[in-house]
Amino acid sequence: MNREDFIKEPVEDIRVSERDTVADLIEKYCKVHGFTAADVCRAVEVLSEGLRNSDLRFLSFTANLVATGLRGLLAQMVRSGYFDVVVTTCGTLDHDVARSLGHKYYKGYFEADDVVLAKSDIHRLGNVFIPVENYGPPVERLVKDVLRELGKTMVAPYELIWEVGKRLSDENSILRAAWERKVPVIVPGITDGAFGTAIFTYSEELKLQGKDFCLDVLADEKLLSDMVFSSKRSAALVVGGGISKHHVIWWNQFKGGLDYAVYLTTAQEYDGSLSGARPREAITWGKLKPEGRSATVYGDATVLLPIIWAGVLAKVQKA
């Protein structure tokens, strides 16, 4: 590359006013350039293009976000029609069901005395306080009620999740939105939470009655396989890391990799973790195409996701 290739576009100074929209702010981030502003600018650009040009669009996120008010935004995103499949963790099901049933989560703080909280029967999730009775038991009761009502000896996880979503009346429910739009919610670690524990104990109860029950997890994988192999282009918005991130990029490697990938994360790559791995590492595994477009934004999703999604909506609805 020549010297001129490095000095094409100058940084611009900006001003803001109370009349600025989020779209205006994104444009100003693009002018600011340094440092995370440039990443937000690119994320909006890449995600907007990916949603427009792809016929298979993944939304992946971790459960902790569902314990916050971001749950409503995630439900809105599922209901928007811009995503074809959700990949997440069992905690998402737990928090969404619990809150949809009217059980409150409360504003707390990180520095709370955890011993006192434990004695008071209060769970702490970061700076969110959850009364013990508001979390596990109501989730397990509903899941078992749905299983009994269905009366099936075998069910796919995504089908069961839809059945639960069908019975929730909360407009802020992710599972309700997924059922309405028929967006499959894939939870590869479905036994890792109250929702999955309820399935296990239901199965054990049936065994005592001499009956069998099978959770057909491979049906979810078959569904993903069919979606990936029937697609022409794929895009993913990945919020957080862990199994929900890996399951998206894992399946896309079998079709040559994602065409578009946007990561929102707080994890770093120096420890070699999957959560911290950047899109460029995914290229070496065939999980992102070498010519694919990608962006990584470091920061708290409760701050970044509303800004990025508002910027994306402004772009895709304008196009």
Swiss-Prot record:
GO terms for molecular function: deoxyhypusine synthase activity. InterPro entries: Deoxyhypus_synthase_arc, Deoxyhypusine_synthase, Deoxyhypusine_synthase_sf, DHS-like_NAD/FAD-binding_dom. Keywords: Hypusine biosynthesis, NAD, Transferase. It is an enzyme of class 2 (transferase). Pathway: Protein modification; eIF5A hypusination. Transmembrane segments: none annotated. The active site is at residue 287. It catalyses: [eIF5A protein]-L-lysine + spermidine = [eIF5A protein]-deoxyhypusine + propane-1,3-diamine. Pfam families: DS. The keyword Metal-binding does not apply. Gene3D superfamilies: Deoxyhypusine synthase. GO terms for cellular component: cytoplasm. Belongs to the deoxyhypusine synthase family. Catalyzes the NAD-dependent oxidative cleavage of spermidine and the subsequent transfer of the butylamine moiety of spermidine to the epsilon-amino group of a specific lysine residue of the eIF-5A precursor protein to form the intermediate deoxyhypusine residue. This is Probable deoxyhypusine synthase.
